[in-house]
């Protein structure tokens, strides 16, 4: 066998590596999420392969939802940059996100709200 190339890879074309995020069509890193899931589990690192893909898809969807609502809030206020205030308005303005995200957002301010009993009717005026 002098001079010839022999081995497992002889004659095969090498394919480019495709990440699990690309296979799943996601932007969030499936491999990194899988690593974090394995490091935080109690069953000695046993996490299914699809668990990381599913978790990454959920995180990506929730992030896109919050960013879309925050972008709408910033457009309503005629600014081009999303601030913590816009995130706060977006999350507290949506009933489902409000029940899901209970965290306090630093720099988010408060949500304006006036109770209905405090609002006077149009025909009434206060007498002194």
Swiss-Prot record:
CDD domains according to UniProt: HFD_H2A (cd00074)
GO molecular function: DNA binding; protein heterodimerization activity; structural constituent of chromatin
One BP term from GO: heterochromatin formation
Keyword Acetylation tagged: yes
Entries under PROSITE patterns matching the protein: HISTONE_H2A
Region (M6 cassette): 89-100
PTM annotation (N6-lactoyllysine): residues: 12, 14, 116
One Gene Ontology CC term in the entry: nucleosome
Region (Disordered): 1-25
PTM statement from Swiss-Prot or TrEMBL: Monoubiquitination of Lys-122 gives a specific tag for epigenetic transcriptional repression. Acetylated on Lys-5, Lys-8 and Lys-12 during interphase. Acetylation disappears at mitosis.
Record PTM N6-methyllysine, positions in chain: 5, 8
Cellular location(s): Nucleus; Chromosome
Sites of the Glycyl lysine isopeptide (Lys-Gly) (interchain with G-Cter in ubiquitin) crosslink: 122
Residues recorded as bearing N6-acetyllysine in the entry: 5, 8, 12
Biased segments, Basic and acidic residues type: 1-12
Keywords: Acetylation, Chromosome, DNA-binding, Isopeptide bond, Methylation, Nucleosome core, Nucleus, Ubl conjugation
PANTHER family named among the record's database cross-references: HISTONE H2A (PTHR23430)
Assembly description: The nucleosome is a histone octamer containing two molecules each of H2A, H2B, H3 and H4 assembled in one H3-H4 heterotetramer and two H2A-H2B heterodimers. The octamer wraps approximately 147 bp of DNA. H2A or its variant H2AZ1 forms a heterodimer with H2B.
Family, as annotated: Belongs to the histone H2A family.
Biological function: Variant histone H2A which replaces conventional H2A in a subset of nucleosomes. Nucleosomes wrap and compact DNA into chromatin, limiting DNA accessibility to the cellular machineries which require DNA as a template. Histones thereby play a central role in transcription regulation, DNA repair, DNA replication and chromosomal stability. DNA accessibility is regulated via a complex set of post-translational modifications of histones, also called histone code, and nucleosome remodeling.
The name this protein goes by in its record: Histone H2A.Z
């Amino acid at each position: 066998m002098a001079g010839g190339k022999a081995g497992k890879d002889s004659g095969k074309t090498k394919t480019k590596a495709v990440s699990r995020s690309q296979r799943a069509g996601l932007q969030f890193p499936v491999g990194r999420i899988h690593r974090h899931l394995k490091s935080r589990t109690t069953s000695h690192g046993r996490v299914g392969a699809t668990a990381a893909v599913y978790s990454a898809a959920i995180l990506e969807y929730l992030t896109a939802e919050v960013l879309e609502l925050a972008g709408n809030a910033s457009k309503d206020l005629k600014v081009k940059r999303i601030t913590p205030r816009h995130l706060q308005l977006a999350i507290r303005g949506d009933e489902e996100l409000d029940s899901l995200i209970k965290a306090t957002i630093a720099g988010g301010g408060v949500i304006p709200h006036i109770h209905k009993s405090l609002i006077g009717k149009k025909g009434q005026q206060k007498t002194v």
